[in-house]
Amino acid sequence: MHCKKYDIPENLFYDTNDFWIKVNGEEAVVGMTDYGQSNTGDILYLELSRAGEIFKQGDKFGSIESGKWVGNLTAPLSGAVLDSNNELERNPRKVNIDAYGEGWMYRIKLSDPNELKSLMACREYAAWVAEQETSEEEKG
């Protein structure tokens, strides 16, 4: 599915911090959405949590720096990091180039699958993105 110029795959969950989540049983792969990476701009630096780190939904689980923005990555779900994409620390632009592929950030073990209910499906996220775009156009 596309929303304006952004790719929004239908088989994923999304949050309002512009993360995508691909669930497989009790595990999930997490990355930044196409919309998120586009708004962030060229990503210059990423610091990711390491395997074994445990976090709650909404906790900081990394940091990011781009030409436009410096800030924290906020966990979309509670869990433990099983693996992080260390290649992104050497080449963070992979998030800009292939957000849903080589730009993945984490593989996590979910600690509360009920939190999936707080996430958006493709169509909900597409509507949210369209709303954000309209809001930005009205401001600028």
What are these regions (language model features)?
Residues 45, 60-63, 72, 80, ...:
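Residue-level recognition of specific faces of alpha-helices
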Residues 1-57, 97-98, 102-113, 118-140:
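Acidic, low-complexity mobile loops and tails
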